[in-house]
Amino acid sequence: MSKIDLTALATEARNPRTTELDALSTLDLVTAMNDEDRKVADAVQRELPRIAAAVDAIAARMHKGGRLFYVGAGTSGRLGVLDAVECPPTFSATTEQVQGLIAGGAGAFLQAVEGAEDSTTLGPADLQARGLGSKDVVVGIAASGRTPYVLGALAFAKSVGALTVAVVCNAGSPVAAAAELPIEAVTGPEVLTGSTRLKAGTATKLVLNMLSTGAFVRLNKVYGNLMVDVQTTNAKLKARAVRIVGEAVACNETLAQQLLDQCDGEVKAAIVVGRKRVAPAVARTLLLTHDGSVRDALAAP
């Protein structure tokens, strides 16, 4: 394997503010970290137009039945998995609709798999195993912007006509160049040199939050700022569903629960029933007619 040159990467540079990190008092140490973390939001802000473009493109593909794949290694891969697994309970997405792939497979989430991220063939193999097609979206995540696993995945995605997005934390990287829609949240040197689980990881999480949340908002999974497609799979989420219906209908918890019971726990239908005073079957028809949009269903005559 050829020698890797990391000297040009901002994420690998020494942070001049923390060259004496081990000598700082604990308060000064965490203050330095907090000060550096403040820069993350600014790095993401600079990329908002690109992030918005990616959200719209992802939503358009998913509306036609496409899937969203996050692909990364190490921390980047784990962040993709983390975002993907939250989509089913939050938006009633299927486990197929948003998937997180990490170099080395599921076991690499808890323990690093030696050499997996350095392979340009594992990424294509992982995507091929999931039947990647032209309707799908692949988001390549790599703080460094040079991870071979991600580069291979993006190249394969392009070859089958899938939309490609990159989320990186260095400017002018190979991963960004390999994607149709690159997002470069340049966070600079880490407090601990090269530890991209810190600022770069935080920036990546913020971007992924926007990509998935924004896409599902565009897919009518949200009404106002209410999580109206929540899956009521545990006590906390059942209680949240009651509160959501209560907020949307402007009713007490008792009536909200009754509406949910009438609608077999479907929050969207319960809101339409409560607001329009229609039967659950009519509410479901209105929602189906208006592509799942609570707002449009409520506005319908």
Label the predicted regions:
Residues M210, A215-P301:
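Short, amphipathic alpha-helical interaction segments embedded in low-complexity terminal/linker regions
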Residues P49, Q111-A112, T232-N234:
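Active-site pocket-shaping loop/turn-to-helix segments
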Residues T11, A32-V40, G100-Q111, Y223, ...:
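Gly-rich Lys/Arg/Thr-decorated short loops/hinges at beta-loop-alpha junctions or inter-strand turns
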Residues R46-R61:
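A short, well-structured juxtamembrane/interface segment
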Residues A57, A153, L211:
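Aromatic/hydrophobic pocket-lining residues that form π-stacking "cages" and hydrophobic walls in ligand
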Residues F69-V207, A215-L219:
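Glycine-rich phosphate-binding loops that contact phosphosugars or nucleotide phosphates
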Residues M1-A43, E47:
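Cofactor-/ligand-binding subdomain signature composed of acidic, glycine-rich
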